[in-house]
Amino acid sequence: MNEKIEVFGARVHNLKNVDITIPRNSLTVFTGLSGSGKSSLAFDTIFAEGQRRYIETFSAYARNFLGNMERPDVDKITGLSPVISIEQKTTNKNPRSTVGTTTEIYDFLRLLYARAGEAYSYMSGEKMVKYTEEKVVDMIMSDYQDRKIYILSPLVRNRKGHYRELFEQMRRKGYLYIRVDGEVQELTRGMKVDRYKNHNIEVVIDKMKLGGTENETLRERLAKTVSTAMKQGEGLIMILDNERDEAKYFSKRLMDPVTGIAYKDPAPNIFSFNSPEGACPQCKGLGVIDEIDLKKVIPDDKLDIHSGAIVPLGKYKNQMIFWQIDALLKRYDCSLKTPVKDIPKEAMDEVLYGSLEKLKIAKELVHTTSDYFVSFDGIIKYLRAVMENDDSSAGKKWADQFIAEAQCPECHGHRLNREALSYKIWDKNIAELAEMDITELRDWIDHVEEHMNEKQRTIAVEIVKEIRKRINFLLDVGLDYLALNRQSATLSGGESQRIRLATQIGSQLVNVLYILDEPSIGLHQRDNERLINSLKELRDMGNTVIVVEHDEDMMRAADWIVDIGPKAGRKGGEVVFQGTPADMLKTHTLTAQYLNGERKIEIPKERREGNGKTLQLTGCKGNNLKDVDVTFPLGELIVVTGVSGSGKSTLINETLQPILSQHFYRSLKRPMPYKSIEGIDNIDKVVNVDQSPIGRTPRSNPATYTGVFSDIRQLFVNLPEAKIRGYKPGRFSFNVKGGRCEACGGNGYKTIEMNFLPDVMVPCEVCHGKRYNRETLEVRFKGKSIADVLDMTVNMAVEFFENVPQILPKIKALQDVGLGYIKLGQSSTTLSGGESQRVKLATELAKRDTGKTLYILDEPTTGLHFEDIRILMDVLQKLVDRGNTVIIIEHNLDVIKLADYIIDMGPEGGRGGGRMLSCGRPEEVAKNKESYTSRFLAKVLK
């Protein structure tokens, strides 16, 4: 086997004929500026080629179903192993996917409960029992000696109906007696019961007196009767002591000896909330139900109904529903013009939930000869009808704005039915284990075998071993604060990536090439060492690990470093260094200069004092927050810190940002629970600059997102040639007919279907990739067509448009955030998360601000090199200098040390976090002995 992986002549995206060598079974870090070509080399070249080779082993028929797998633009790659990519982008949005299901720990717990769990009755709390027919006969013979008994088969348990057919069926089978609601009666033709009442019905199989001289004969008869009764009662029989009128149940299945309820034999799917066997019947295994939120139905009770106080109805219209409400309110001496707060509670209850009495509608309104009487079901029932019956996306979106998620009242958020929740091991059901964080769960698993009997221990030993192994992998990647029932959709990119990393370590594969994209995202310095050790463990198992990373600790721990640069975009794409970390420190690449201390991000000489105004948030209780009160000083650079899972994102992204978005933009996103907010009037808007893509189609690009493309098109429309031809702005759009090339629909390329081979994308032979038709391209500004402008990098465009004031600021903003290397027309699907975030930031920078804007950024250093961070922070400092407030959630110490004000959450993640440990200037926060952040911050402030 080759001792190394070699890449020759890689030219994907901006790579310039790159040759690299990667030692096999090493931990290799790819580093360099954002946009230098790291991901192009790791994912778009090495991973893409590995995946293509794997798919080529399939038959042509199978390949037809696997989508496109183009060969990357590379001369050759030798020594390539099977490749597994672990990226951040593939977070699962399915509400049924949880940490437990993703890591398979929950699957092993289901197996453990199915094989070693003890069942208890959800009715009486008694331990469930099960018997063989022989054991049942023995117990009846001993318990009912010398007594007269009835042997019955239960048919109906607490259900409504007249049961005429059931009685007739039993009569035809030859049975003479039936017990209905505790009373034994003779079965007669046409017998029935009250169909509107709940009934318990048992058929009498036999009656006998035990004891006496004919014991053996009686035993034989009893055995036959029990067998017949078991078949008729589907494994359950009832013995009625005639003299004492006492009933007792026996079953071949798990059964409550007191009430007679029986369970199916346990199987793993009974404990799955994704299976009909185990899911709660009300919420279908989701743990939550949709409820109508009255605060959203009537947000302002100072308004009257005529003016639109009831939002779903809007303002008064000449419609039946308003006539009904008016008629109802008249009974309480109110009208549609009475403010809601002045309408009696009983009247509003009837408006919302309906009235039992008929309402009189005046004959003039309905154009009849006499008054019209109607019933009224209420606004809530009307809304529910829309929710249930309108399948259109518009109808659902309209109804969604009045809905809030509430905990399911049936399962109390546990997702499982009551039978599944009745199985216990060491006094815990499976849902209680899923609620524990990983650290608590490990303690439970470590001691559970001490609380099992010998049989349970024998069954559980291998299952417990597998669970313990997977738990330890999660702890190793710093996810001790997560609970198994945490939805995958609520995880950050870094968290979901580290879960997949833990799953891969658990899979025990060898001779594999793993490629990871910044696994340290969202990870506190405290947990970094454990993550590095996990990657080394993956390497030591016999795998090669490539990590695209900017983290200093990761680089120093690597066996091999590939530094790509020297700059980004067209000025990048070259290997400026490859070798060991020790050798790299001796070079003068940009990365090496930051590692050896030649360059660094300077600590500001003084911190801002702000504008004296604040934003105060009190009583925050979302997720793990423990009644947090926090004050944000405005006009400052605020950094929110803390270990992973300490509550930073819950406080900012799930509480503060939705509150402000609802206030300024009537956003539908609901904030987490909080008590109050003060000081909103001190800001005029909130801007959330996240890392989601700026567009999901190849047609969107930085020019269209920032809005500068509209200005560029208008510039071309105003040119003399365009005016002579009568061109409008649409002529210069590649999205609409007119000016675009119709041969390719404005894409610039055509997709050729190859049937059993991958589709091939070739440049359009008519426009040659220009996207526009010949006539449109004849209109030129300073010798350049609209297609030439889209093909310019931002740096080129800044020079080109330097004398065009309506265009320059928007393009200059892109340059200021370090995106000078990207093209104006570059497809948004090729931009990284960090690049997308900076395009959004540039768009905001180009807008006129009032100096009262609040900007929120969640880990903006994701995907950024030391130099990129310096440029980004300069931009953010300028925003604050203009009077705005910037709140950043961040672990990167180069950002934390630049803060004017720090809010430190912790001390741990999950249940051990959720408190505000300290706040203030970095120098003050660094003195806190309880905080992990403080220990690391104190070192960089020296």
Task: Label every PLM stretch briefly.
Residues 1-942:
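Conserved phosphate-binding elements of NTP-dependent enzyme cores
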